[in-house]
């Protein structure tokens, strides 16, 4: 299935990809087709959590 997600900031793809692999490493998850949906989902959930944290800090001026 093709990925149809459009990035709001196209230059952010590399940074998000790097974040994905850093988080996977922290969690001990080997990303790929052999990983469970739960393991891959935990990485995606943590990415979302960290991006929300970053946005809140920027909006709050911290």
UniProtKB/Swiss-Prot annotation:
Keywords: DNA-binding, Sporulation
DNA-binding recorded as keyword: yes
GO molecular function: double-stranded DNA binding
GO biological process, one term: sporulation resulting in formation of a cellular spore
Site (Cleavage): 22-23
One Pfam family here: SASP
Superkingdom, taxonomy of origin: Bacteria
Family the UniProt entry places it in: Belongs to the alpha/beta-type SASP family.
Other notes: SASP are degraded in the first minutes of spore germination and provide amino acids for both new protein synthesis and metabolism.
Functional summary from the UniProt entry: SASP are bound to spore DNA. They are double-stranded DNA-binding proteins that cause DNA to change to an a-like conformation. They protect the DNA backbone from chemical and enzymatic cleavage and are thus involved in dormant spore's high resistance to UV light.
Protein name, per record: Small, acid-soluble spore protein A
Species in which this protein is naturally found: Priestia megaterium (Bacillus megaterium)
